[in-house]
Swiss-Prot record:
MRNA binds at residues 78-83, 110, 128-129, 178-183, 223-227. Disulfide bonds join 133-171. Residues 13-24 have a biased composition (Polar residues). This is Eukaryotic translation initiation factor 4E-1. It holds the Pfam family IF4E. Belongs to the eukaryotic initiation factor 4E family. It comes from the Eukaryota. One of its GO terms (biological process) is regulation of translation.
Amino acid sequence: MVVEDSMKATSAEDLSNSIANQNPRGRGGDEDEELEEGEIVGDDDLDSSNLSASLVHQPHPLEHSWTFWFDNPSAKSKQATWGASIRPIYTFSTVEEFWSVYNNIHHPSKLAMRADLYCFKHKIEPKWEDPVCANGGKWTVNFPRGKSDNGWLYTLLAMIGEQFDCGDEICGAVVNVRSGQDKISIWTKNASNEAAQASIGKQWKEFLDYNESIGFIFHDDAKKFDRHAKNKYMV
């Protein structure tokens, strides 16, 4: 998207700080009620009218527009094709819109088992078949079940705040809620570009203050070998 220079943050760090400071509602207090299976939003419907009411008059544009997607766990068993149940939730292009959406959807710890929540650059679908994702791969970080909320938020802020040196390589991120653990992955475009992937993986660990090794899997290998796919890169 095109924005005037005066509206842009002077650096990635400034933009990241701006994003954090623009949050109209902290999440340190009472948590939301547990969701029924397949739910993603709370009591307030996530629609344009509700979001518009909370936006400030002078928005802070992001470098890219981003779209939240949700894969409903209750719909997965009814779909014969993988990915058929993934649906877009909302596309945002400003700091204020991000917080309006983020504060109106449940965080990973409150999602139903087998739910998948995505945040991808606008017009990139979170599917292997998408032309931008087809030759890519993903880095993955594992968390104990229900302990990925902060990691998910920090990942989102780093992505939309353009904190990665090789940010053009990034397609988006996903959090997968499973019985024993939560998994957050960053999807990238060109899996064979080892230098770019290593840069993204190392910086991501720094942003999360994550000390364990993480691995990068090519999408092609994931399609062929499923859970038995092996890491091509480690950082």
